[in-house]
Each structure stands twice: as C-alpha cells, then as structure tokens.
Amino acid sequence: METRDLVIIGGGSAGMAAAISAFDNGVKDILILEKGEFLGGILNQCIHNGFGLHEFNEELTGPEFLTRFVNQIEQRRIEYKLNTYVLSLSQDKTISYVNRVDGMATIKAKSIIVATGCLERSAGAIEIPGERPSGVITAGQAQLYLNEYGYLVGKKVFILGSGDIGLIMARRMTLEGAKVLGVAELMPYSNGLNRNIQQCLKDFDIPLYLSHTVSKIIGKDKLEAIEVSEVDSSLKVIEGTARRFEVDTLLLSIGLIPNNALLNAIGAPQSKTRGSCVNEHMETSFDGLFACGNVLHVHDLVDYVVEEARVAGLGASKYLKGELIRGEHKILTEAGEGIGYVVPSQIDLDEAEDFIELKFRVKRPSKDVYIVYSCDGKIIKKV
C-alpha cells in the first residue's frame, strides 16, 4: 500500500492553503485529492468580485483568487489528483478513493487534513407545502449552471433566503436578463453581508421581504407560481397574509452545512457547527487528523478560510515532526448567551501560543452589547 506523509482531502481554497502552509513548514511529501475537474472548488463558479481584500489587498474574482493559489501549488510541485472521489477514511489514516486512472485505490497517510467544504440545504430540508415541479433549485446550483455552463435557469425568479449566494444570484440573474421579483427571508434580519444587500438588492431595486417565507409551491410538472406569507415571532405562517407570485424559478438560499460525512463516519465528535470538534491546531480528536475551512464551520469570506487552513497546515507539519505537545492542561470552549458556536472547541494550555484566535458566530444581530470571555465564572476580558 502506498504511504504518504500528508494527504489533503479537498483541493479548494482551504485544501490548497493548507498544502502550501505544510510545504513551507517542511512537509514535502504531500498529495491533494480533489473530486472536481479543477483545483479551486466552489471558487471556479464565483465569477463576481469581492475576494482577496484581506489576503492580497486587492478585489479579485473567484477564479483570479484561486489561480494565485494554484500557481503556488505548481511552483512547489505539490502533487494532486483531480476527478478523485474519496470513499472513506479510517481512524488509522487509511483512505479509499476512486478515479479513472487508478480505479479503486487505497492509500495510507501519516497525517490527513480534511478540507471538503460545505453543502447547500435543499428543498427537502424545509418541507415547503405543494408539488415538486422542476424550477425549484438551490442558488449555488443555479450559479454553477449559469457561470460555468452558460445556462439561465429561469426568466421570472423568486429567491427564498437572504444568504450571500442568494443575494449574489439575485444580481447575477438580473444582469443576465431575468426578472427577480423578490427575496424572502424567514428571519426579521438578513443573513447576508451588508455590502451584498446594498450591491445586489438595493442597487437593482429588488425587494427584500423580511419575516416572510414561501408557504406554497404551485405547479405539477413545471413551477407556475409560489405563495409568500408573513411569519410570526415563532416563525409560523400567519394565515391570510399569502401573496402569489407568478414565477418559473425558485432559488433556495437557505443555509450551508459542513460536508463532514467522512469524519462523521469514523466517529469524530461533532460541534454545534455540524463540523468536527478541533483544538487550536485544527486537529480533531484523532491524532494527526485535521480539519479546516467550511467543513469545520461556514465562513463569510474565503480570506478567513485561508487563514484557518494555514493553521491546519502548520499543525500537520508539527505533528509529522513530533513537535505537537500533548499536555494535561486542556480547557473546553463553550458558546454563551447569544453565541451560536466557538472554534476551536478545545485549547491545550501546555501547547498554546500567547495569542489564540477564537472564531464564533452570533445567533442574531444585537446592539449595545458586550462580548464577554470568562473562565470558571471569572471574567477574563470584556469588549
């Protein structure tokens, strides 16, 4: 069986950044396994700008951003396999994969970084009443069809959910000649970045219906119309508030979830993000097995994905060199009131640097509040 020092599952921005970080910290035997036809992952279909402001101090499109990392991969001669689907991994770091060149194959790794990204929630996740006609599609899939294959999925469009992909597709569909009748958001606030609300909706006079949801899908074979209703504070549909929209396409932007199936299958403890629990090195509960990027928790900016992936790459290099200290003094992080989750889930005080970055997401927008860090009931910091 072939053995490699480091195998990275996923060749998107997280996988490439982790590989570059590990290489630059002394790991030369690296293999990236990527299921797609090209490196770069989701960035291949993100032809809009807004990437790289933190990483390069420039505003780049998705393909421009990923090309800079692909160039670094090529310069370092880091090996990668494309069109390669990983079937499973085991606790002893054995990976089974399949592709057209190798067929079904198995490889042993001394260390693994999982960077498999995230998935879109589909219509089945929210159980909208009505038929199941064609024309109901996730926003990311519509983006793929339009930006990579040149297919406009509809002419009269409504979007459910105000996530960033949905907002960006509202603008993209408008620019390509479709009529976007509106965006409905279940919550009383948008889940997208403020800049996307301004640039993608307000600049194009696309209405945003807060505290609304699609309450019915109409059409048997093809989508004919939808009903949009208000919801109350319990997120239940308010009877008598339905408005009918004649559309041929409903785009769903109803959330992303980590694509964590490989780690779940081997029993890696799961955090509130639906990703795996990790320490400050992005190492899971299994020694030498790391996770980073959207498979860990969904990021707003790819620049933040890259930062996190570098930590995982450095952690893997330390593990391979025997430099990771297994101390006895560990503390767990826990999300308090108003906070959805915290990453990392665990910090090793014997190994911790002077500065540890905690990443978290609030449950809802709030004003005039403090962020309080406490330990054993004592306030450490208040900002």
Model segments located where?
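FAD-site-proximal beta/loop scaffold in flavoenzymes
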Residues: 136-146, 249-299
